[in-house]
Amino acid sequence: MLKNILLCSLQISLLGMSLGGNVLIWPMEGSHWLNVKIIIDELLRKEHNVTVLVASGALFITPSSISPSLTFEIYPVPFGKEKIESVIKDFVLTWLENRPSPSTIWTFYKEMAKVIEEFHLVSRGICDGVLKNEKLMSKLQKEKFEVLLSDPVFPCGDIVALKLGIPFIYSLRFSPASTVEKHCGKVPFPPSYVPAILSELTDQMSFTDRVRNFISYRMQDYMFETLWKQWDSYYTKALGRPTTLCETMGKAEIWLMRTYWDFEFPRPYLPNFEFVGGLHCKPAKPLPKEMEEFVQTSGEHGIVVFSLGSMVKNLTDEKANLIASALAQIPQKVLWRYKGKIPDTLGSNTRLFDWIPQNDLLGHPKTRAFITHGGTNGIYEAIYHGIPMVGVPMFADQPDNIAHMKAKGAAVEVNMNTMTSSDLLNALRTVINEPSYKENAMRLSRIHHDQPVKPLDRAVFWIEFVMRHKGAKHLRVAAHDLSWFQYHSLDVIGFLLACVASAILLVAKCCLFIFQKVGKTGKKKKRD
């Protein structure tokens, strides 16, 4: 009897394995990897087989053997971890030193172009590491993958998918001014009311704001055309036919966008764009004993959680002391993720940690506020738990993210470059003491939780959907098949203008003919 039960269990187990899909991952570094890793874990839980392509010089992606269904294919590239770390560091410093503003915009783009060129060199090394590795490509071909999940920030995932003859899905937070979503994904972005990403604008724009928004879109379009155009020849050579980066990216079956309407302003989107913002969020777990004891000493005042993310390791002594001085003046206890020199002005209410369980702290009932750099992952954890924020944005989408939270009444912003100790102190007192900030944060939290399907389940559903149906062509808009002048109906407008011009010309000719006839008749009568 026991033997039969064991055999039955084994058969069910094998059946589950056979029904599992075969997923290939083309990942991106940093926080992008953290989001994809959450999806991978859920795919593994649902008994899919997952293979992750990892460059030998990867910085954040650490191969692990958490499951026999998870495989890391490590391929050689002509650089080490130091190179990727250097590019990331240059990117952050360039943004910190030249944060886009009307007075610094051209300097910013000039300096950022250099960093992007360096990024392209690294990306090309990664592409070559896979596409020119015949042994690896042959092995991948034999694995019979059913779908590839890619982060479009790193090019070539789409090429790998097309080479293997499988559909691919994108996981994306944003591209500058949504150039990729707009030009490659064909999503409409009316500049009259849809703020360009990185513009720090909202959907409530004055005339001046709309001018600024329009210019922001055009400038980012220009940047995309000039800095990413070089990939067109690479894609053409790799695929063996004339094509472009954008045309190839447009073949993505589904775009998993890492935001949701608790964060975004209302705007048009397409049916193959799915929102999965906050897929990494989860209920808080108990804190480590020592940390919980410190939190409990806060009494009725509660705690403040402070983190500038993983990209900023430390601050200048002056800035650290300025911050510590402000934190020392609030009655709350503060848990600060910080690895630098201990500030001289550090108060007895503040404790420093190399690392903090951020999600668990934000979900703690004693948490009153979150001081954040404005990364999307951190903001979503605050939304999930209904915690008001003090934003200290520094680079990339962070200023834009905080602008969204300010517009929704859940955050106050301070400028890292110009803030004083009193600025930070006043911002903290505002979000802690004014009830509207907590109320708005809770409203966003309720919106986030009130979804028919959880973000992570939605992401996995669409990956499985594409595997089941070999794609999602029924969701692909016909705009992909049109040229740019057809898309904007310029041929139709030209035809109609020609018709109107022809009609006007015909009427004018008729009038002239009639006038001439009448004139001749009048002259003839006078002569008679």
From Swiss-Prot:
Protein's membrane topology: Single-pass type I membrane protein
Catalytic activity: glucuronate acceptor + UDP-alpha-D-glucuronate = acceptor beta-D-glucuronoside + UDP + H(+); 16beta,17beta-estriol + UDP-alpha-D-glucuronate = 16beta,17beta-estriol 16-O-(beta-D-glucuronate) + UDP + H(+); 16alpha,17alpha-estriol + UDP-alpha-D-glucuronate = 16alpha,17alpha-estriol 16-O-(beta-D-glucuronate) + UDP + H(+); 17alpha-estradiol + UDP-alpha-D-glucuronate = 17alpha-estradiol 17-O-(beta-D-glucuronate) + UDP + H(+)
Entry's localization field: Membrane
Record GO biological process: bile acid metabolic process; response to symbiont; sensory perception of smell; xenobiotic metabolic process
Residues with attached carbohydrate: N49, N314
Extracellular side: 22-494
Keyword set, alphabetical order: Glycoprotein, Glycosyltransferase, Lipid metabolism, Membrane, Olfaction, Sensory transduction, Signal, Transferase, Transmembrane, Transmembrane helix
GO molecular function: glucuronosyltransferase activity
Top-rank EC class of the record's enzyme: transferase
Listed PANTHER family: EG:EG0003.4 PROTEIN-RELATED, UDP-GLUCURONOSYLTRANSFERASE 2A1
Function, in words: UDP-glucuronosyltransferase (UGT) that catalyzes phase II biotransformation reactions in which lipophilic substrates are conjugated with glucuronic acid to increase the metabolite's water solubility, thereby facilitating excretion into either the urine or bile. Essential for the elimination and detoxification of drugs, xenobiotics and endogenous compounds. Catalyzes the glucuronidation of endogenous steroid hormones such as androgens (testosterones) and estrogens (estradiol and estriol).
Protein name, entry field: UDP-glucuronosyltransferase 2A1
Gene coding for it: Ugt2a1
